[in-house]
Structure formats: C-alpha cells, structure tokens
C-alpha cells in the first residue's frame, strides 16, 4: 500500500439548493458546498484532480471565500508548472475551468465523457463549455484504469456519461474521491430515511439508475470516501487527517 496524502484545494464556496446534491431530499433548503481541486502528494509525480471552476463564474452573490488555484498551490510550495498529471473527474465547466494553468501536465479523461462534452445533448448543454478544454490533449480512457502506482480511476458514470472517480492508496487504506457531485449526506443519510442501501442518490444525473449503482460501486471499492463538494474539507489540511484513528470502513473524512 502506498502512502499518498490528499490535500484539498478549496477555491471557493457556493450556496445552492440542497436537492441538487441529495435527489429530492431537502427541498427548499439551501446549503453551502465547497469548490475544489485536489492535490495528490506522493513520492514522484505531482497529481491534481480537477482544475475547478473559473473565478469569473464564482464571482456572483452566492459565492464566497474565493481564492485562486495559484495561491492554493503556493501553500504546498508548488507552482502550476510543477503539476505533472491532471485527472478530470468529468468535463462540466465547474471542474475543468483552469486547464490552461498547467502547461506541463498530462490530462486524463474518459473517452465517453470527452465525446459527450464536445457536443452535449441540449438538456445538458449549459453544464459544458468546450472552450475550457479544447486545447487540451487528453489521454482518453475506456473504463477503469491505473494512472500511476497507487492511483487509479474507477469508471462511475451516471452524473455524466463519462464520470470517473479516483482511488488513492494511503497508509490507512484506499481513499475514493467521488467523480460525481455529492456531499457527505449522500453516503450518510438520516436514520429516519431508512434507505435500502444506506445512500441518497445524487441530485444531478444523466442516468439516475446508473448514478445510484455507481455510488455503491465506489463505496465497495474504497475504505474512505471523499464526497466531491463536501464543505468539511474547506479547513482540512490533508487526508488522512492525522488526528483521526481510522478503524471502520466507509468513513466520510
């Protein structure tokens, strides 16, 4: 087992209707979600998961705590040119906005996602902007794939046609960063809901059944789940969190 560290790179927060995360649960509620890239700190390559949302798109009244990716990387002693690999969980505009910042990086995306993103269906068109990635020479993947020793992608479509989650080996087990947009409550529903499988489906989906099944696929593949938009990571320096003793599967941390 490798000993990677996951460093959350929060570049802002956004207030959204809760049901966009938790499929029809919490109608009328507004929550604050985190907007992130994720730096994977390891022995060799500098790896980034997603490039996050462009600042211009976050500067509206419901956005707060906005900071640039360059500033976040500086916290880790890095510059954008130091990034070797970028893994795109999917190609919606809020996850792929800063590709041009990383001139030396090799980019990975799923083939199905790329093909959809360059000519999206009208029902999903407003989530994509190919200008953000049209100059990127992606390595296009076809399903589950190892990226480097200790880091692999798990094909988890449903949120989009080509969503991929990322599995990272750490000293406490395999950490899974969801490729689909969700919060901790998707994997920790209120007891009163009495859900069959212990999950709440995501609220934004291309295929709801596929999305649900792939939530379970990811949960079964890892020991610790990082929900992609969970606000908790705004003030977390690294995962695994040193102060926590990890002794149970599927802890949301």
Task: For each feature predicted by the language model, list its residue ranges.
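Basic, amphipathic N-terminal segments that precede the first structured/catalytic domain
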Residues: 1-29, 145, 166, 240-241, ...
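Conserved beta-strand hairpin/beta-sheet module of binuclear metal-dependent hydrolase folds
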Residues: 11-71, 165-183
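Residue-level marker for buried hydrophobic side chains located in beta-strands
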Residues: 47-49, 87, 107, 175-177, ...
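Short, glycine/acidic-enriched loop or turn micro-motifs at the edges of active sites
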Residues: 53-54, 93, 113, 181-183, ...
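Metallo-beta-lactamase
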Residues: 67, 72-78, 82-94, 106-155, 161-238, ...
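Short, conserved loop/helix-junction motifs that constitute active-site signature segments
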Residues: 100-103
């Amino acid at each position: 087992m490798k000993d990677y560290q996951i460093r959350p790179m929060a570049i802002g927060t956004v207030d959204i209707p809760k049901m966009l995360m938790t499929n029809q649960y919490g109608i009328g509620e507004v929550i604050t979600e985190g907007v992130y890239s994720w730096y994977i700190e390891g022995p060799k390559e500098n790896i980034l998961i997603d490039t996050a949302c462009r600042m211009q798109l976050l500067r509206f009244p419901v956005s707060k705590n906005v900071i640039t990716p360059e500033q976040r990387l500086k916290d880790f002693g890095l510059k954008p040119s130091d990034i070797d690999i970028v893994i795109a969980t999917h190609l919606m505009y809020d996850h792929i906005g800063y590709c041009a910042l990383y001139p030396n990086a090799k980019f990975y995306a799923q083939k199905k996602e790329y093909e959809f993103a360059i000519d999206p269906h009208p029902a999903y068109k407003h989530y994509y902007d190919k200008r953000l990635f049209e100059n990127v020479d992606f390595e296009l993947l076809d399903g589950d794939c190892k990226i480097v020793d200790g880091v692999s992608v798990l094909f988890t479509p449903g949120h989009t046609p080509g969503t991929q989650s990322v599995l990272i080996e750490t000293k406490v087990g395999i950490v899974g960063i969801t490729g689909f947009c969700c919060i901790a409550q998707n994997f920790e529903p209120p007891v009163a809901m009495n859900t069959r499988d212990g999950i709440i489906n995501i609220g934004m989906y291309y295929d709801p059944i596929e999305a649900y099944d792939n939530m379970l696929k990811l949960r079964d593949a890892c020991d610790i789940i990082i929900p992609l938009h969970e606000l908790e990571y705004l003030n977390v320096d690294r995962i695994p969190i040193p102060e926590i003793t990890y002794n149970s599967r599927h802890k949301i941390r």
